[in-house]
């Protein structure tokens, strides 16, 4: 066997031994985050476990566990009666359901669930229409999307590098496509 193959085989086996979850050494015992499941606890019998509407859906539907009315041009809080353990390395983003936004002018806000939050998940609903919007028990009001995050430490500096854009914001680049 050529020397390159011997070294490759040796390092490959060593890497496998160091990175397996059942190794008996203290060098590298880090279990990867589990993105296959997430824990959910029902806080009432009216709570509904989040589900995806289709195999390709990005979000898990969140349902209201209580009846409520979102007043015209107002807001309301829809409680799901769920505790959700968001996997480490991610956060849960509460996003609008496209059908509610398009058909009923219902949007949602304040949509971040941190991985260490363990309270009842609530959905802030905004009604941008001229009529009150009724929510029944079990109605799907939002969707939960898991997103990976990076949490670097802030570093205070005296200067920040300049860019071509600079401080321009809020439409400073225009609406036309740049050629």
Curated annotation (Swiss-Prot):
Alphabetically, the GO molecular function entries are: dUTP diphosphatase activity; magnesium ion binding
The disulfides recorded in the entry are none
Tell me a GO biological process for this protein.
dUMP biosynthetic process
Known catalytic reactions: dUTP + H2O = dUMP + diphosphate + H(+)
* Pathway entry: Pyrimidine metabolism; dUMP biosynthesis; dUMP from dCTP (dUTP route): step 2/2
Transit peptide: give start and end: 1-41
UniProt binding sites for dUTP: 97-99, 111-114, 122, 165, 170-171
Q: What is its main location?
A: mitochondrion
Its Gene Ontology cellular component terms are: mitochondrion
Gene3D superfamilies per UniProt: 2.70.40.10
Needed cofactors: Mg(2+)
Temperature remarks: Optimum temperature is 60 degrees Celsius.
Q: What does the protein in this record do? A: This enzyme is involved in nucleotide metabolism: it produces dUMP, the immediate precursor of thymidine nucleotides and it decreases the intracellular concentration of dUTP so that uracil cannot be incorporated into DNA.
This one is known as Deoxyuridine 5'-triphosphate nucleotidohydrolase, mitochondrial
The source organism is: Dictyostelium discoideum (Social amoeba)
């Amino acid at each position: 066997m050529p020397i390159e193959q011997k070294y490759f085989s040796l390092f490959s086996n060593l890497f496998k031994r160091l990175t397996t979850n059942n190794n008996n050494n203290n060098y590298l015992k880090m279990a990867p985050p589990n993105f296959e499941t997430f824990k959910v606890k029902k806080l009432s019998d009216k709570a509904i476990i989040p589900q995806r509407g289709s195999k390709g859906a990005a979000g898990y539907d969140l349902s209201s566990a209580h009846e409520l009315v979102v007043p015209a041009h107002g807001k309301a809080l829809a409680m799901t009666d769920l505790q959700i353990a968001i996997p480490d390395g991610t956060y849960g983003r509460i996003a609008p359901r496209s059908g509610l936004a398009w058909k009923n002018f219902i949007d949602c806000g304040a949509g971040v669930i941190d991985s260490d939050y363990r309270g009842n998940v609530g959905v802030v609903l905004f009604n941008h229409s001229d009529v009150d919007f009724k929510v029944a028990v079990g109605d799907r009001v939002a969707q939960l999307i898991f997103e990976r995050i990076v949490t670097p430490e802030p570093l205070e500096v005296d200067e920040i590098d300049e860019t071509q854009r600079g401080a321009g914001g809020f439409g400073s680049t225009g609406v036309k496509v740049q050629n």
